[in-house]
């Protein structure tokens, strides 16, 4: 027994006061740092080949990446070393194929897809930029700026000016925002009945239907005169106001009010209430008759005043184009004309007037509201069965496709005219909606649209006709999502508000910077001169009789 080693009983740690660890810690046991978010899948990695190069460190422990796990020795700093962890990326869950994007046309991935080409481009001094990603000037594209300009995220806010200066003595009556107006509806409004028809119309020249980009035709200037009479200046409306109706307006004014929810620019309409009658009129020397250009575009014209691409210059250009186009496409001269029942009241001997026919129509809007409106046609067309079809002729104009961020007509109009029309519906939604409402109110059988472009982007005086297109107004209103029930509801709502007010003059104005309309009570002489005072006296005389 003396030759054997003695048996020494081991010392067992025993906690007599609880179930936890002993009070005396084992300071000599090595400690392995860990993080509870680490993956515990290392034991199965040997079953798959090591092909994950992009996420090679997906199982690496992320312990110590944050400063909260850092160890600082305060007593002995001789063995302390700083470890640079700036190059280590935080742990991200591995997801195969996420955010892969379009690799078919990407020159950076052609080397991996087997489509040819290198993995990295060789454009200038910037490695890794493909040839297709660079412009012709050798500068790489800034995709973030492109996206910002495209969707208007970084576009500067521009405060638009009001169509009329609001004075301090004007009383605000009502403010209606567009969401409320869009909920209005007045269904089952019957077709308007003709009360008086006057004027003469020329026949449409069908050769303009065969015009295309390769067979363009220059736009000619016309010297024919057109009278733009307001509601109270129209002698026929003055005559009708004695007997029938209590609401009087023109188709341009009605279309502006009915399509107000699509407008961005400011405009105003005057309501003259005398007794139980209301005259919807426009101010003299106002820009009400000018056609807007790219009003609803993401990037409307922002050029300085005096430039050919300023909003006012483009509006003047578009108005002249429409005036010349609607007369050029007609067979003038000594050709046969379509005559209405009465001649035009302002016809003078030796004066060449434009081809235009007026229909004074009557609508019953309910609640004893009878609307009398002057509508117009621009021409007539011989139908396939010999019937006469009335036309509303309008023209869209192209001024600079690059500046307006739209399609170039000379390249897309013949092959993709639907895409061109969709672009115009996006940039000129309000103008096209007004034209459609005017065509529906007048009862036109067709809406003729012409595509007129500048000869040069820097020349706003010479234009060419590239194409014509025709639509049925009712079908076209459905295509552009224009609800006539909502349009009638907006008009009826504003009429009811003015009907409840005392006699006087009221101004309906579109807010220049907010989607709402405002109704003001203005003085009688707010917009009138001495001649207009005489006109107001004549109107009161007519109503008294």
UniProtKB/Swiss-Prot annotation:
GO biological process assignments: cap-dependent translational initiation; formation of cytoplasmic translation initiation complex; regulation of translational initiation
Biased composition (Basic residues): 95-113
Recorded GO MF terms: mRNA cap binding; translation initiation factor activity
Chief subcellular location: cytoplasm
Keywords annotated in UniProt: Cytoplasm, Initiation factor, Protein biosynthesis, RNA-binding
HAMAP family (alphabetical): eIF3d
Function: mRNA cap-binding component of the eukaryotic translation initiation factor 3 (eIF-3) complex, which is involved in protein synthesis of a specialized repertoire of mRNAs and, together with other initiation factors, stimulates binding of mRNA and methionyl-tRNAi to the 40S ribosome. The eIF-3 complex specifically targets and initiates translation of a subset of mRNAs involved in cell proliferation. In the eIF-3 complex, eif3d specifically recognizes and binds the 7-methylguanosine cap of a subset of mRNAs.
Protein name (Swiss-Prot/TrEMBL): Eukaryotic translation initiation factor 3 subunit D-2
